[in-house]
């Protein structure tokens, strides 16, 4: 096993790209993974359960993973992601806030709703996913 043996990692935006590669690497190093991905394309269109594909790949490599489809843009979504980890593994050791969206427009052409969507995922999403983890760390005295 690797340096993350039996650690539990939540990785948001893990259905594609950097998040997926991080999930695969962590799994190879022995971590149990919560693969979170809403399943939308970076521009917000579509909805596929791509997290299932990453979970299947991790399991094919001998790892352990579960999928989660909640959006990081709401506090409830962040709590549900954390709950998925606790329900599946009983602990959380690592949170990687990787989820992101793209509104490929210049500021001149951007609507306020585009800006709000980006901030909800890229900024508030970090808070929504990290706060339950930080509270858990403090409440379980895992600061060391």
Which positions does each model-derived feature cover?
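Substrate-binding pocket helix/loop in short-chain dehydrogenase/reductase
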Residues: 58, 106-107, 114-116
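Rossmann-fold cofactor-recognition segment
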Residues: 56-75
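The beta1-alpha1 cofactor-binding region of Rossmann-like NAD(H)/NADP(H)-dependent oxidoreductases
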Residues: 48, 69-80, 112
């Amino acid at each position: 096993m690797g340096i993350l043996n039996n650690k539990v990692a939540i990785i948001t935006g893990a259905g594609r790209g950097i998040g997926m590669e991080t999930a695969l690497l962590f799994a190879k190093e022995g971590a149990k993974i919560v693969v979170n991905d809403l399943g939308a394309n970076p521009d917000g269109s579509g909805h596929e359960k791509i997290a299932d594909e990453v979970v299947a790949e991790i399991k094919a490599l001998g790892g352990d993973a579960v999928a989660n489809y909640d959006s990081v843009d709401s506090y409830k979504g962040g709590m549900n992601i954390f709950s998925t980890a606790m329900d599946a593994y009983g602990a959380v050791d690592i949170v990687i806030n990787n989820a992101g969206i793209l509104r490929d427009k210049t500021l001149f052409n951007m609507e306020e709703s585009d800006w709000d969507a980006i901030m909800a995922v890229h900024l508030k999403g970090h808070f929504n996913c990290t706060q339950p983890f930080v509270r858990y760390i403090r409440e379980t005295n895992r600061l060391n």
